[in-house]
From Swiss-Prot:
Family: Belongs to the TCP-1 chaperonin family.
Its job: Molecular chaperone; assists the folding of proteins upon ATP hydrolysis. Known to play a role, in vitro, in the folding of actin and tubulin.
The keyword Lipid metabolism belongs to this UniProt entry's keyword annotation: no
GO-annotated cellular components: chaperonin-containing T-complex; cytoskeleton; cytosol
Subcellular location: Cytoplasm
Superkingdom of the organism of origin: Eukaryota
Primary localization class, coarse: cytoplasm
Protein name: Probable T-complex protein 1 subunit theta
Lineage: Eukaryota, Fungi, Dikarya, Ascomycota, Taphrinomycotina
Keyword Oxidoreductase: no
Keywords, ordered alphabetically: ATP-binding, Chaperone, Cytoplasm, Nucleotide-binding
Subunit and partners: Heterooligomeric complex of about 850 to 900 kDa that forms two stacked rings, 12 to 16 nm in diameter.
Length: 546
């Protein structure tokens, strides 16, 4: 009789509370469903008519936006497979600024197609291999369907052509004004070698009130606060930056002072006053006319700064202080004292101006190319201004992609339909089991024009059938979805000036596909029991990003 040894199962291997999911049904299908649920949330925000979401995070901060990267970042996703999509979206947003929602939606659609093929009898490995083959064909097709290119990033008209579509997906109706604003800001700080362009050189200041169309670009830096003292303007001044409070150091020991008469009381604080006066006079004699500090300013120090007509402003943010140092060319000092000549910076004009009902301080450079430009945004509510800022950040980030690759493809879902048709054709010519995965990969691109038409209130089936008919005709590769539905639901993206940046599209497709391949190659999910006890406190919402 054969000896039968019982197999050790999961509960005998691990501590109590572990969850083990294995097999195609439990591991792969459940992961697919989780990611599809996430993609359904952001899918309604795709395109110019994408809907806004109100998200309240664990710190009770409210976000009103249709920016997919912001939405899923603040949703606090805990599913391990869905977190892969969150990471991919954040990478796309940080590197290129555009097509973040495409990553989520396309990943969800690919996994929906994969789930159907698994139920048909294909294995996840066969599907993954087919998707890999389809990805390489997609990159080849994208090279072939390039529609245009940016001749030079130093031209405002050429920049607007690339930025406009990206901004219209976030702020439809305001894209012309905002793209013009972003293009002006970029050209203000663009170095002679465009490849050295730094997105941090463009900052946004939000001032509530008035309308968006009163927004403007200011050369230099704008701080939404007034100087601390009575001096509000300085020209061609040397700047000293202190990363400490402007105060004299106090001893840690406590002491009791015995005063015998009134004269001793009058003389008691004279030593402190003389010390501060000598400090400020030394700073003045060194040529400094503007002082910037990140800490508080002592009343006595402020008195002597006003007496010597030195402008002093407080910048509490470490990030802004570091950026200001880069603008004026100064080195931040850790204690109050006279800066060395190489530690001082210089600025052409520091002045206080009124924007709306608020007074702001401007550090302005006179020359044509400045180190920093500030976009001053106006709007009615804080959430609206925050959403405008996200749209501007995406528009600025697009320039990073244009510097690396200046080619454009047709937008409005036209390039997606072209990819769909060509990949289905490739799949039909591919022998063997992988042809199913390649064809399904191609059909997944249909989700973009379908979703754009759905969100615009059109009949998606009717629009898709018209797009198929148009793209099978000669010179029909530029036909996309018309969200304003002036004709039959389709338009010529070339005539409408709707273009996507090729590099952003390539990156989004690659990130989505790699995420799908990772999920399909998972055969087991092992989750431990969450640790007990109180949850760790969240980050302080008033801290800087640094």
């Amino acid at each position: 009789m054969a000896l039968r040894v019982p197999k050790a199962s999961g509960p005998q291997l691990f501590r109590e509370g572990y969850r083990i999911m294995q097999g195609v049904e439990d591991a792969v299908i459940r992961n697919c469903n989780a990611i599809r649920e996430l993609s359904e949330i952001t899918r309604t925000s795709l395109g110019p008519n994408g809907k806004n979401k109100i998200v309240v995070n664990h710190l009770q901060q409210t976000f009103l936006t249709n920016d997919a990267a912001t939405i899923i970042r603040e949703l606090e996703v805990i599913h391990p497979a869905a977190k892969l999509v969150v990471d991919a979206t954040q990478q796309q947003e940080n590197e290129l600024g555009d097509a973040a929602n495409f990553v989520v939606v396309f990943t969800g659609e690919l996994l929906a197609k994969a789930e159907n093929m698994i139920r048909m009898g294909l294995t996840p490995l066969e599907i993954a291999k087919g998707y890999e083959m389809a990805l390489s064909h997609t990159m080849e097709v994208l090279e072939e369907i390039c529609a245009d290119k940016i001749e030079t990033v130093e031209s405002e008209k050429e920049l607007i052509k690339a930025i406009r579509t990206c901004i219209s997906s976030k702020q439809y109706g305001n894209e012309d004004f905002l793209s013009d604003l972003v293009a002006k800001a970029i050209l203000t700080v663009l170095p002679k070698d465009p490849s050295k362009f730094n997105v941090d050189n463009i900052r946004v200041v939000k001032i509530m009130g008035s309308s968006l169309y009163n927004s403007q670009v200011v050369k230099g830096m704008v701080f939404p606060r007034e100087p601390e003292g009575t001096v509000t303007r300085s020209k061609e001044a040397k700047v000293a930056v202190f990363s400490c409070p402007l105060d004299i150091s106090q001893t840690e020991t406590k002491g009791t002072v015995l005063l015998h008469n009134a004269q001793e009381m009058l003389d008691f604080s004279k030593g402190e006053e003389n010390l501060i006066e000598s400090h400020i006079k030394e700073i003045y004699d060194a040529g400094v006319r503007v002082v910037v500090t990140s800490g508080n300013v002592n009343d006595l120090v402020l008195h002597y700064l006003n007496r010597f007509e030195i402008l002093v402003i407080r910048v509490p943010s470490k990030f802004e202080l570091r950026r200001l140092c880069r603008v004026v060319g100064a080195t931040p000092l850790a204690r109050m004292g006279v800066p060395m000549p190489e530690e001082m910076g210089s600025v052409d004009v520091v002045e206080t101006i009124e924007i709306g009902g608020d007074r702001v301080t401007v550090f302005r450079q006179v020359e044509d190319i400045t180190r920093t430009a500030t976009i001053v945004l106006r709007g009615a509510t804080k959430t609206y201004l925050d959403d405008l800022e996200r749209a501007i950040d995406d528009g600025v980030n697009i320039v990073k992609a244009l510097v690396k690759d200046n080619r454009l493809i047709f937008g409005a879902g036209a390039s997606d339909m072209q990819l769909c048709i060509r990949l289905i054709s490739v799949g039909e010519k591919t022998p063997g089991i992988y042809q199913h995965a390649i064809k399904q990969y191609g059909e997944a691109f249909e989700v973009v024009p379908r979703t754009i038409s759905e969100n615009a209130g059109l009949d998606p089936t009717d629009v898709i059938s018209k797009l198929y008919a148009a793209h099978h005709k000669e010179n029909g590769e530029s036909i996309g979805v018309d969200v304003e539905c002036e004709n039959d639901g389709t338009l010529d993206a070339k005539e409408a000036g709707i273009f996507d940046v090729l590099l952003a599209k390539k990156s989004a497709i690659r990130l989505a596909t790699e995420t799908v391949l990772t999920v399909l190659n998972v055969d087991q999910v092992v989750m431990s029991k969450p640790a007990g006890g109180p949850k760790p406190p969240g980050p302080n919402p008033h801290w800087d990003d640094d």
